[in-house]
Amino acid sequence: MMSNPIADHSQKIYQEQCNILREMAEKSNCVIVGRCADYILKDMNPFRIFVYAEMEGKMERCRQKEQSHHNTMTDRELKQHIKDVDKHRAQYYGFYTDQKWGDRKNYDLCVNTTNADIKNVAAILTKLFE
């Protein structure tokens, strides 16, 4: 059976990512966004937070970023782009963890940011751990 060089390379990248995340978590308290960190660090008992938003909240946030980058997508294009990004995140998470991305049982806290300012949410969450 032949090995797949792309799959082999992806697996090596994932392994290195695991090593880096573990090393960071062992050195000090840290916040890691994504990268299957909840799963990779599960033996270290991390506080796992899943931040999500409804589609209209995601679109609004993207529109705000879009203005500063001078990009423009139609609502339909933007919605499809967001769905594609979420689909790839779910596939990545599922592939490496055998768990469902966004499933509340995998997290200690789930935060809906649809009607919230992300910076305010981050500040509030930071205060939880001071």
Named regions from a protein language model:
Residues 71-118:
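Small-molecule kinase domains that catalyze NTP-dependent phosphoryl transfer to phosphate-bearing small molecules
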Residues 1-29:
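ATP-dependent small-molecule kinase phosphotransfer cores
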Residues 37-38, 53-58, 116-117:
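Conserved nucleotide-binding/hydrolysis micro-motifs of P-loop NTPases
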Residues 43-64, 73-84:
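Conserved phosphate-donor/acceptor-positioning beta-strand/loop module used by diverse small-molecule
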Residues 18, 118-126:
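Short, amphipathic alpha-helical "lid/cap" segments that border enzyme active or binding sites
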Residues 34:
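Divalent-cation
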Residues 24-27, 37-44, 49:
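RNA pseudouridine synthases
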